[in-house]
């Protein structure tokens, strides 16, 4: 396997995440604009006017850009669907990710490449063949085992199933990130409880809450599996990535458009390193374990292998929110950067800063710049071991950063 044969697709919900994905070695990014995507109600969403900048930034780095248009589409939204896809084509988008035939058919009609979303629950080669009329890449159902994925891949090859480009249909699979309790993300719980549809990009994440099962006859409350009975742990394939790509997967999709730029950078870096090790013949259980430890330092709900190993029941999270071994704390913002001497002037706003702490700068152009704080100075140049909130300080940086960047530390 050559590293160039496998595509790492990174989630992008902000310009900071876009820069981080590019820094880390992503081959492609996916994102949403407006209300026609599965993160439309999230803060991690762009507007139609952002399209040009996102595509241009990605392409300048040799990275493909995919637009998610993967919600259910209603009749009164047809014009919006056309406007979004028209704009995407005009700005040079590489493909849209869709599930509704209104989006799929219109995109193909005007010559835009289509990838079929996991919402379509593709679970066999006949369905792949059906969608190959319009799509060059399909995301198979997350509930499949690796053996089932391999069977589908064999059928694609043996039956010469090709997409509109004339090439064999590519298999894309989720490799890392959050999993939903429902089949291929088709959930009604949020709509039922809060009138916010998960299938319209407005999931209220009710499955992540703690629940108790009550015996209505006795009133006894049963504490089941830590009570997070609807919340699966996060998918992680880094410790069986050789078998994962060996099943025929060619696009590794990372979940997490609503997660931070530091998450995007760390996850892409780790999977890129694992792929390069597989290529070089140096991929070992010890290396994979080390990568998994690094993955655990950013947002996660604990890890399991998903359904790929054939387990019918999910491993449930033991945490509300993140189980990361480290958490980020906002320190302050960069008020100036002196490029010649690589020193940032930082206004410490929210938490004190001390020598020896692991820190990172984050910005739309900077992406993520991590370092250990080796030295710290007052603005008059006096060395300091720590600085308190409300003060200005000088920090020597390992890489160029920018005015307006945010500074965080890991604790």
Language-model segments: which ranges?
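Surface-exposed amphipathic alpha-helical tracts and adjacent flexible/coil segments at the periphery
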Residues: 1-24, 28-40, 55, 61-71, ...
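Short glycine-enriched loops at secondary-structure junctions
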Residues: 14, 71, 99-102, 120-122
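Charged helix-capping and loop-helix junction motifs
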Residues: 44-50, 79-83
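Well-ordered mid-protein domain cores that form the structural environment of catalytic cofactors
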Residues: 81-117
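Short, glycine/polar-rich helix-capping loops at beta-to-alpha or helix-loop-helix junctions
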Residues: 123-128
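Positively charged, amphipathic and often flexible ligand-engagement surfaces
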Residues: 132
């Amino acid at each position: 396997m050559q590293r160039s044969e496998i595509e790492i697709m990174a989630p992008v919900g902000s310009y900071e995440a876009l820069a981080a994905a590019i820094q880390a070695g992503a081959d492609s990014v996916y994102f949403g604009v407006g209300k026609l995507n599965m993160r439309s109600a999230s803060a991690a969403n762009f507007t139609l006017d952002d399209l040009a900048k996102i595509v241009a930034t990605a392409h300048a780095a040799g990275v493909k850009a995919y637009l998610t248009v993967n919600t259910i589409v209603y009749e009164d939204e047809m014009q919006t669907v056309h406007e979004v896809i028209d704009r995407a084509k005009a700005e040079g988008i590489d493909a849209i990710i869709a599930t509704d035939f209104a989006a799929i058919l219109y995109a193909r009609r005007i010559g835009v490449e289509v990838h079929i979303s996991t919402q379509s629950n593709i679970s066999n080669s006949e369905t792949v063949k059906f969608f190959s009329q319009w799509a060059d890449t399909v995301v198979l159902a997350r509930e499949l085992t690796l053996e089932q994925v391999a069977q589908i891949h064999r059928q694609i090859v043996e039956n010469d199933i090709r997409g509109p480009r004339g090439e064999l249909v590519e298999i894309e699979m989720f490799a890392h990130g959050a999993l939903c309790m429902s089949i291929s993300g088709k959930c009604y719980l949020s709509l039922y409880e809060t009138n916010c549809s998960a299938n319209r990009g407005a999931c209220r994440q009710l499955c992540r809450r703690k629940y108790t099962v009550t015996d209505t006859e006795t009133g006894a409350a049963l504490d089941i599996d830590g009570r997070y009975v609807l919340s699966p742990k996060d998918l992680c394939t880094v410790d069986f990535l050789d078998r994962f790509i060996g099943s025929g997967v060619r696009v590794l999709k990372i979940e997490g458009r609503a997660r931070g730029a530091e998450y995007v950078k760390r996850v892409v870096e780790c999977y890129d390193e694992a792929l390069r090790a597989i290529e070089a013949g140096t991929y070992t259980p010890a290396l994979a374990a080390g990568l998994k430890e690094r993955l655990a330092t950013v947002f996660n709900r604990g890890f399991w292998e998903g359904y790929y190993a054939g387990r019918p029941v999910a491993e449930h999270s033991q945490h509300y929110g993140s189980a990361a071994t480290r958490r980020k704390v906002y320190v302050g913002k960069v008020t100036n950067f002196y490029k010649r001497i690589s020193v940032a002037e930082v206004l410490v706003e929210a938490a004190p800063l001390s020598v020896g702490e692991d820190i990172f700068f984050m910005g739309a152009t900077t992406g993520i710049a991590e370092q250990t704080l080796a030295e710290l100075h007052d603005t008059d140049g006096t060395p300091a071991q720590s600085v308190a909130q409300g003060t200005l300080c000088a920090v020597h940086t390992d890489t160029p950063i920018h005015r307006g960047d945010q500074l965080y530390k890991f604790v």
